[in-house]
Amino acid sequence: MKLVKPKKFLGQHFLKDLKVAQDIADTVDTFPELPVLEVGPGMGVLTQFLVKKDRLVKVVEVDYESVAYLREAYPSLEDHIIEDDFLKMNLHRLFDGKPFVLTGNYPYNISSQIFFKMLENKDIIPCCTGMIQKEVAERIAAGPGSKTYGILSVLIQAWYKVEYLFTVSEHVFNPPPKVKSAVIRMTRNDTKELGCDEKLFKQVVKTTFNQRRKTLRNSIKPILGKDCPLTEDALFNKRPEQLSVEEFISLTNQVEEALKTATASGN
């Protein structure tokens, strides 16, 4: 079989360490009864361990050369190799709307977008595991007060328990990336509803972290406007990285109340 050359524009760094691949494959075992979707399998170094598990496995790959390689290397997967862009797919059609585990050695250039896609489909993705850039993994797992705590941390931790599992050297890839990688696992928590307007919650989180050096009283103004009244809650004197998920929910409710008050008074 003709080997696939990694394509820079697709952010491809092919994993070549079988022990690391096995360890990543084993992270899906938290939900042994669910099917698995692997994103960006490349030449199947992770796939080979996933297919050995007694469960349905599908892979989605945007690179036509990798798809051709996979079809030849894994004939038993023929009907489950999907040539498509994961970010544009309707995930509810994959397993007839049933839940599945998401995994992969994710391309660095779209890892954040993949996790936003996961959040959009959290009703059918109870678990997401895989390898990403170490810096992004640390950001997702970070808690309040950390310099790496940010938009991804809050939005993901609102719905998922995050585990930073292990760090991976850059030398186990072809070509080696310039940074280290890490494997994480995100498992849905018990939250059914946030207790606030979800769309406004996202807006509040993104707006405040985009001006993270400002106090919330100032960074929230793009949403509220200059003349919108705020309560004297001490929460507004904090910076976004100081707030827990629960405090962001409280903040969102206060912002919504302030918007209603402003609308009612004609501001």
Swiss-Prot record:
Cellular compartments annotated: Cytoplasm
Transmembrane annotation, as ranges: none
Gene Ontology molecular function, alphabetical: 16S rRNA (adenine(1518)-N(6)/adenine(1519)-N(6))-dimethyltransferase activity; RNA binding; rRNA (adenine-N6,N6-)-dimethyltransferase activity
EC numbers, comma separated: 2.1.1.182
Subcellular location, principal: cytoplasm
SUPFAM superfamilies to which the protein is assigned, alphabetical: S-adenosyl-L-methionine-dependent methyltransferases (SSF53335)
Xref: InterPro entries: KsgA/Erm, rRNA_Ade_diMease-like_C, rRNA_Ade_Mease_Trfase_CS, rRNA_Ade_methylase_Trfase_N, rRNA_adenine_dimethylase, SAM-dependent_MTases_sf
Gene Ontology, cellular component aspect: cytosol
GO biological process: rRNA methylation
Binding site for S-adenosyl-L-methionine: 13, 15, 40, 61, 85, 105
Reactions that this protein is recorded to catalyse: adenosine(1518)/adenosine(1519) in 16S rRNA + 4 S-adenosyl-L-methionine = N(6)-dimethyladenosine(1518)/N(6)-dimethyladenosine(1519) in 16S rRNA + 4 S-adenosyl-L-homocysteine + 4 H(+)
SMART domains: rADc
A Pfam family annotated for this UniProt entry: RrnaAD
Keyword field: Cytoplasm, Methyltransferase, RNA-binding, rRNA processing, S-adenosyl-L-methionine, Transferase
Signal peptide: none
Family note: Belongs to the class I-like SAM-binding methyltransferase superfamily. rRNA adenine N(6)-methyltransferase family. RsmA subfamily.
Functional description taken from the UniProt entry: Specifically dimethylates two adjacent adenosines (A1518 and A1519) in the loop of a conserved hairpin near the 3'-end of 16S rRNA in the 30S particle. May play a critical role in biogenesis of 30S subunits.
Protein name as catalogued: Ribosomal RNA small subunit methyltransferase A
